[in-house]
Amino acid sequence: MYSISFAPLQGYTEDVYRRIHQDVFGGVDTYYTPFVRLEHGEVRSKDMRDVRPEFNQGVNVIPQVIANGGNELQQLVDKLTGLNYKRIDINMGCPFPLQTRHGRGAGLLPDVEAVKEIVGVMKENLGVEFSVKMRLGLEDENEWKEIIPLLNNVPLNHITVHPRIATQQYKGEVKMSAFDELLEACQHEVIFNGDITSVDDIKRIEDTYGDKLQGIMIGRGMLGRPSLAMEYKSGKQMADAEVVRRLKVMHDRMWQHYEQIIPGEAQRLAKIRTFWDYTEAILGRKAWKKVMKAGNLKNYLKAVQEL
């Protein structure tokens, strides 16, 4: 049976979501934080709050970082090791231009010299166990061919691969033939990521690759059906009505949390509504639209109650 990781998703899988998901659904072996990054030369305080140990107690959390080279990475490593983290994941896969145009995320993949710097930092920090999340390339699905040999020369826990190029973002087909080629070339454990939305999808990967893979990382598919990891681990499908019931439990606990920390009704509503972004399939279009289109807090909470 594969290990199941919950992918880091900016704006969704913050500390409160991770804690409550584990309590209400479970089945996830490892949760990754949305990437910690520098802003104006300093580590973002918002990102550091999300990884603080007191907000992640009882949850197996690995912080992810995003950097454009060795100097940025070392700053981030210093901050996280200061919080006693021994595992750090490095993002070489973020497809969004806000990061890639600054040489971060998948923007690293065509920049062999920057990756060499990152490898150097990993070698210098032997007390940290690193992993990497990457795509096949920024604009070319062959860019990984210069990167994997560099990563083969440094100890890594694993490499997570999303077999698309960054310019696809999440559209188009995953490039499985290129993934197969990468898998053969990689000397580390590999985790598969991309387009996993059902237990059948997990089993299809499992049947194809068996013990060639360490596990599966799921992102948007888990936001849409948070029972997915538990269903795979237990071998039992949860009834849709029970998934929705537990979604409402999750939602209500998150809402209570936001009431305490977010001033202003409009701000709280804008924040909590994103909880439902990927749930149209499980809720049904009519009910989902009612939640997403509610114009004020009273109508929103009524729409949620009626789910």
Predicted regions and their residues:
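Flavin-dependent oxidoreductase catalytic cores
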Residues: 1-307
